[in-house]
C-alpha cells in the first residue's frame, strides 16, 4: 500500500481503497468455490460508496449485486451499472414499475408484495424477475412455512401467465459472527426443506442462497448456488474472534490538525471540563465531531495517529471538533499535519473494530457513520 496523504482542500475524508475491495472480493470468491458471488452494496456500500464498490466488485469477479431497497438499485442503474441487481426490502404500497423498467430483480417476502409486483407487471407489460425470501429463523421479513404453500400456488399461476421469471430462493442467517452456532445448521435444514417443498409442487428456482460473509468464509457446506457477502467485501472480519481472515479494511478516516496550542497543568478542556491537564502539555484540535460520525461516547477514550504515534483524545467530543493530547515538551505536530482516526491498522492507527470495542457496538456501525464534513474519496486499485 502507498502512504496515506491528506487530499488538499478537504477538511476531513473517508478514503476508500478500491484495491482492498478488489482483494477482498477475490478472497471471497476463493472461499465460495463453485458458487457465484453477490456483493451486497446496500446502505451506500456500507458507507463506502455503492457505485464505486459495485464497479470494483464486478471487476474482481462478483456476478451480481444485492441492495435493500429498489431506490438503491435504481441509483446503481442511474450510474450505469448493468449487472444483475436484487432488492429485498419494500414498504407497503410501493410502485414496482420503475424496478421492472430498469430490470431490477425483486425479492418478495409475502403474498401482498407479490400481488403489488404483479400489479406493476400488468401495468408495464414487463416480466418480473422474482426471488422469494423465506424466514428460516431470523424472524424478520420472509415467507414463513405456513404461508409458503400459498406462495407456491401464486407463483405457479404467475409463471403460467408469463408474468414472472422465477429466479431465486433466499434466506438470511441469524448469526453474522458465529459460523459454528447450531442455529446455522437448523436454518440450513429449514432452507433445504423449503426447496424440497417447492420441487414437490413443481416450482424450481434457478439459484438458492443463504450464506452471509461469515458462512462464505467459514461454512462451505452452506454455499448452495450463490453466496451473499456484505461486510467482508469491505475488509472487516465477519468473525472478529478469528482475526482478519485475510481481508483488508478498505476505509481510512482522517483529517488535518486545525490548531495546536499549549495549556498549563490544572486547566480544563472542552465542555464541562471533564478532563483536567495533569501537567503542562500541548493539544491539537481536530475539526470534526459527532455531527460527522465521531461518536460522542468516544470522548476521552479514543486515540488518533499523528506522525506515527498514538495521541489520546481528551475532554468531550463536540458537534464539530475535539481535542487530543500531544504531550509535554517540544512540539512534533504542526497545524495541517494528518490525523488518522481509524484505518486498516497497518501504520499503528486504530481500527474500526477498536472503535466498536470502545463503545460496545459493531464495526458495521462505525464504517457507516462518517458523514457531514467528512468527504468520501477513493484510492484507485493497483496491481497487487
UniProtKB/Swiss-Prot annotation:
Molecular-function GO terms, alphabetical: alanine racemase activity; pyridoxal phosphate binding
Residues at the catalytic site: 42, 271
Keyword GTP-binding: no
Keywords of this entry: Isomerase, Pyridoxal phosphate
SMART domains, per database record: Ala_racemase_C (SM01005)
N6-(pyridoxal phosphate)lysine modification, residue list: 42
InterPro entries: Ala_racemase (IPR000821), Ala_racemase/Decarboxylase_C (IPR009006), Ala_racemase_C (IPR011079), Ala_racemase_N (IPR001608), Ala_racemase_pyridoxalP-BS (IPR020622), PLP-binding_barrel (IPR029066)
UniProt source species: Mycobacterium tuberculosis (strain ATCC 25618 / H37Rv)
Protein name: Alanine racemase
Pathways per UniProt: Amino-acid biosynthesis; D-alanine biosynthesis; D-alanine from L-alanine: step 1/1
Family: Belongs to the alanine racemase family.
Pfam families xrefs: Ala_racemase_C (PF00842), Ala_racemase_N (PF01168)
Enzyme class name: isomerase
Record CDD domains: PLPDE_III_AR
Protein's job: Catalyzes the interconversion of L-alanine and D-alanine. D-alanine plays a key role in peptidoglycan cross-linking.
Residues that bind substrate: 140, 319
Listed GO biological process terms: D-alanine biosynthetic process; peptidoglycan biosynthetic process
Activity regulation as described: Inhibited by the antituberculous drug D-cycloserine (DCS), which is a structural analog of D-alanine.
EC number: 5.1.1.1
GO annotations of cellular component type: cytosol
The protein's assembly and partners: Homodimer.
Co-factor requirement: pyridoxal 5'-phosphate
